């Protein structure tokens, strides 16, 4: 983990109300470059809502968001993307009928000019070369760039989704990656592959926020863990200073909040 004095992403006093329901209550969260922050909590604790605030899908009722120290307002996911934040969704959001290179290039296609300079065509060969280079830099091994995503295993699909987010944020080593249950429904070997990729991204300077119910994964891959319970942050602790029993206590409410 790097030691930057300014967080890559910082949320202060975030409230999110749905009518009389307070989904988020004065949430303070920060993550630094090269750090993996685990975000834990039971169903309905507010994890997904908080991710949606970070990704620009939801606008908070009140509170402040800062990216690399600069105050930011996200009115849409495009705003957060422009700020250097990428979201890897639980459903992966891959195009099954397209090949790996095309999925890695979505939104940043390489075009070559058409006849007489009119219009333009996707340069698939150039995209495959770029995708191969990017995966090599990430230390990722996967199937051939021409293989359709629908023919990949669950673990391979997850790696493609993670790599797509990583290649979009990793150019200046200042990106922020939001991961929503990246190992859901994966087997042990596939989970290990994803876990290794997350650590490599952090080692390359990417700030990662990982939402998961998988406590062993969180303990293995995260530098720090924050726990939400009923919309409030009840714990924020380095992994080295906690254990499964403490985390389960905060998640279930059996253990009092660190901030009470």
Where are these regions (language model features)?
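Glycine-rich phosphate-binding loops of nucleotide-dependent enzymes
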Residues: 2-260
């Amino acid at each position: 983990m790097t030691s930057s004095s300014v967080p890559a992403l910082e949320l202060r006093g975030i409230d999110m109300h749905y009518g009389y329901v307070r989904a988020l209550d004065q949430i303070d969260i920060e993550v630094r470059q090269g750090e993996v922050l685990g975000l834990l909590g039971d169903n309905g604790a507010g994890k997904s809502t908080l991710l949606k605030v970070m990704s620009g899908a939801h606008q908070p009722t009140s509170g402040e968001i800062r990216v690399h120290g600069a105050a930011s307002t996200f009115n849409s996911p495009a705003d957060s993307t422009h700020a250097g934040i990428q979201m890897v969704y639980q459903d992966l959001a891959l195009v099954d009928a397209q090949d790996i290179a095309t999925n890695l290039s979505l939104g940043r296609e390489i075009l070559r000019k058409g006849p007489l300079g009119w219009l333009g065509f996707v340069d698939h060969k150039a995209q495959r070369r770029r995708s191969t280079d990017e995966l090599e830099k990430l230390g990722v091994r996967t199937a051939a760039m021409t293989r359709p995503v629908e023919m990949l295993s669950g673990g391979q699909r997850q790696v493609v989704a993670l790599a797509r987010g990583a290649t979009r944020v990793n150019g200046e080593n200042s990106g922020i990656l939001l991961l929503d249950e990246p190992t859901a429904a994966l087997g042990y070997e596939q989970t290990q592959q994803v876990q290794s990729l997350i650590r490599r991204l952090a080692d390359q300077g990417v700030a990662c926020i990982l939402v998961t119910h998988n406590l062993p994964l969180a303990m293995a891959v995260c530098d720090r863990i924050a726990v939400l319970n009923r919309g409030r942050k009840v714990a924020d602790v380095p992994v080295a200073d906690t254990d499964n029993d403490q985390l389960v206590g905060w998640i279930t409410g059996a253990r009092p909040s660190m901030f009470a």
